[in-house]
Amino acid sequence: MALLISNQDVERVLDMKTCLEAIEEGIKEYYRGDATCRPRIDVWAPSGDPSGYYQWGSMEGTSRCYGVFATRIKSDIAYWTEGEGGVRTQEKYCQRPGLFCGLILLFSTENGEPLAVMNDGYLQHMRVGATAGIAVKYLAREDADTVGMIGSGSMAWTHALAFAAVRKIKQVKVYSPTEKNRDAYARNLAARLGIEVIPVGSAADAVKGAQIVSACTDSIVPVIPGRSIEAGAFVTTVKGTVELDKSSVERIRTFYTFAPNSDAISHSQQGEGVSRAQKISGTHRAYVAGQAEDLARIPEVQREGGFDKRKLVSFKDLLEGQNPGRRDAEEILAVGGNQIQGIQFASVGGATYRLIKEKGLGREFPTEWLLQDVRN
């Protein structure tokens, strides 16, 4: 029997410790050649919604540890808004605002059978936060105890949980354009972690004095004020270099990416030689359909600068000892450009599936519904 697994099922079994362990093992498997993945690719097509565009995204990967292949697929209508403070963001919905469609399909690498269909929402937020947490574990100062958080949504929540799992965090300062959202985030996170969480009125106020700076936004323009980054800080982003302003790019000594080598690091991290499609997607490859009048609906991601390739380093080099990591307490380091999402969905999906089976959760349905006797 296969399983239909809801977000509620995933939340019952997947804690941050489990997620961090699965992500780290998945990364190491990938770098030593025991797992593989295809980076995220999007397909865009004109929509009947005059203010939006259809966006399909998919990514795949394997996990030898859990014996699974995972594909994560998402189907959205993307649209763009300008929020408080003038920050332009990309929003989305499926069918109607407030609903979303994202699925993880899990298959056995032992016999090929379909194992599960999972809602991706909760797992997605956890795996992104855990990935940043792994980077903090290896690259932030050991005494880092203050976080400057830009963003107050689910990604900002899981990032804070991950940081608290790998460092002794004492304080989080949070900024997002909507005051009630940052106030609620501060109140709820303080209750969850038992630490001081302060809502502040600007990104600069969040960043000042923080040893860990994290941007968790849907913005298509830079949000991190580089001049406010403290010496010795470690910076994480969910959108590669999109969230970094020119000063940030200039002050960061090394920008780590999870791509396996410098040649595989996307030009989208460098801000040069990118196609119209990449400028739309921001951090990954995209194929875009539409005439000029259709394409005019889609604003291009705005970057203020790209990294000199000499600043770009693969996390693989760090784990294998070819890169020293943090060399002193004053240098500013950063991580972004996650190109191994498929590995993460396979490893965290595999760990989650195992726990779901152990606890008897999920809804069973006949595997035969997904099989056929006609050769494809």
Where are these regions (language model features)?
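Rossmann-like adenosine-cofactor binding region
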Residues: 194-292
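Glycine-rich Rossmann-fold phosphate-binding loop(s) that bind the pyrophosphate
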Residues: 152-153
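Glycine-rich phosphate/pyrophosphate-binding beta-alpha loops
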Residues: 119-124, 237-244, 337-342
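N-terminal ligand-binding/catalytic initiation module
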Residues: 1-127, 131-133, 143, 343-346, ...
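NAD(P)-binding Rossmann-fold cofactor-contacting core
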Residues: 166-193
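Adenosine-phosphate binding glycine-rich loop
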Residues: 7-11, 246-376
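Short helix-loop-beta connector
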Residues: 140-146, 168, 230-231
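N-terminal Rossmann-fold NAD(P) dinucleotide-binding loop
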Residues: 156-157
